[in-house]
């Protein structure tokens, strides 16, 4: 009887959490999601997939991210990293994803920092309104305290600022398949691009180590 009661209580709790997680944000592999609603996001890796999803409550949210498209030039892989973008949006009961321009070279991708021509769209390709700003830092980029910078930004009256009292992340962990660092992102990217024979050789090489 006691076990049944515990099970019932757990089921009710999970149902309650699930009922409030009404926004699903899909994160592509070229997006480095840094903060959500002033919180660091822990990424869970799964090697063979390249998409991530984040469940959020209905309401207003702030995302902080970099856009890192990857280009192949000869034998080299070139990553073009944008400045950090701070964006605030509101939504209810939506499946939301990022939409970026298509660039065919690293040189053209550098225009993204100037144009900031990305979108948030729902599953019907409708745009989700948002405010945005770049988090510009003129000093050494290594060792930046981005969370502190964003907290300072959020004290301003900028439309993209995130104020206390807004709803927060329902699940701090993202169901992620892109990895936490550039090296792992590269592995995911080129594994997906490889033919079946190359994939099999790669898998054999890591299982034999």
UniProtKB/Swiss-Prot annotation:
It comes from the Bacteria. Pfam families: DUF2057. Keywords: Signal. InterPro entries: UPF0319 (IPR018635). Residues 1-21 form the signal peptide. The keyword Signal applies. Belongs to the UPF0319 family. PANTHER family: UPF0319 PROTEIN YCCT. This is UPF0319 protein VFMJ11_1730. It comes from Aliivibrio fischeri (strain MJ11). The lineage of its organism: Bacteria, Pseudomonadati, Pseudomonadota, Gammaproteobacteria, Vibrionales.
């Amino acid at each position: 009887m006691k076990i049944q009661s515990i099970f019932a209580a757990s089921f009710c709790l999970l149902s309650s959490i699930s009922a409030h997680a009404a926004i699903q944000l899909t994160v592509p592999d070229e997006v480095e999601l840094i903060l959500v609603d002033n919180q660091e996001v822990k990424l869970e890796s799964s090697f063979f997939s390249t998409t991530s999803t984040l469940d959020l409550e209905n309401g207003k949210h702030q995302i902080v991210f970099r856009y890192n498209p990857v280009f192949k030039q000869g034998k080299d892989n070139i990553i073009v990293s944008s400045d950090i973008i701070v964006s605030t949006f509101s939504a209810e009961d939506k499946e939301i994803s990022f939409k970026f321009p298509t660039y065919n070279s690293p040189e053209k991708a550098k225009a993204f920092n100037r144009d900031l021509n990305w979108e948030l769209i729902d599953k019907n390709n409708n745009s989700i309104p948002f405010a945005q700003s770049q988090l510009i830092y003129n000093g050494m980029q290594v060792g930046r305290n981005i969370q502190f910078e964003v907290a300072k930004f959020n004290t301003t009256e900028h439309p993209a600022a995130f104020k206390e009292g807004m709803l927060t992340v329902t699940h701090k962990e993202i169901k992620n398949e892109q990895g936490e660092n550039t090296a792992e992102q590269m592995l995911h990217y080129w594994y997906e691009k490889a033919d079946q024979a190359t994939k099999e050789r790669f898998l054999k090489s890591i299982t034999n180590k």
